[in-house]
Amino acid sequence: MQTSHSLPSAQLPLFQEAFWASNGAPLLDDVIDSPSSASIEEPAAFSELSLSGLPGHCLTLLAPILRELSEEQDARWLTLIAPPASLTHEWLRRAGLNRERILLLQAKDNAAALALSCEALRLGRSHTVVSWLEPLSRAARKQLSRAAQLGQAQSLNIRLG
């Protein structure tokens, strides 16, 4: 059974005033067309992907993304730093990734993984550095972004949960 809820007509003017009162605030079209929106079109150097569920399911969701990155036309490496233990060379093969274009690097802890990620990005020998860093502070995100910009690369952090 459906019930219809209608707003009392006395409330409608409150909403109309909020929507029609511009107070000099730019409309979305004005923001998109402004010169300062050019930075929106530039790809971000740092991205983060959060996947939750069973580890096997998360890797299944991640496989097409990694496959696409491994087949990138850019001749540089796809570097995977501190992946979960289940992401092995055998898993890469079964998932159909181009293993000839992938560097798989382990780190002893989160701090070492962050340092290794920044160095791999900064060197510019990888088109994309995929890391599994948790937790990742705002300062660490900025570090990864700066390193990616220096190396003209992309940083992708995967959070599994």
Curated annotation (Swiss-Prot):
PTM: Is rapidly cleaved and degraded by the Lon protease once DNA damage is repaired.
Keyword Transmembrane helix applies: no
Sequence segments annotated as region (FtsZ binding): 99-104, 106-108, 120-125
Keywords tagged on the record: Cell cycle, Cell division, DNA damage, Septation, SOS response
Signal peptide: none
Statement: the UniProt record of this protein carries the keyword DNA damage: yes
Disulfide bond residue pairs: none
Classification via InterPro entries: Cell_div_suppressor_SulA, P-loop_NTPase, SulA_CellDiv_inhibitor
Induction: By DNA damage, as part of the SOS response.
GO biological process terms on file: division septum assembly; DNA repair; negative regulation of cell division; SOS response
Family: Belongs to the SulA family.
Role of this protein: Component of the SOS system and an inhibitor of cell division. Accumulation of SulA causes rapid cessation of cell division and the appearance of long, non-septate filaments. In the presence of GTP, binds a polymerization-competent form of FtsZ in a 1:1 ratio, thus inhibiting FtsZ polymerization and therefore preventing it from participating in the assembly of the Z ring. This mechanism prevents the premature segregation of damaged DNA to daughter cells during cell division.
Quaternary structure and partners: Homodimer. Interacts with FtsZ.
Record's protein name: Cell division inhibitor SulA
Organism: Pseudomonas aeruginosa (strain ATCC 15692 / DSM 22644 / CIP 104116 / JCM 14847 / LMG 12228 / 1C / PRS 101 / PAO1)
Gene: sulA
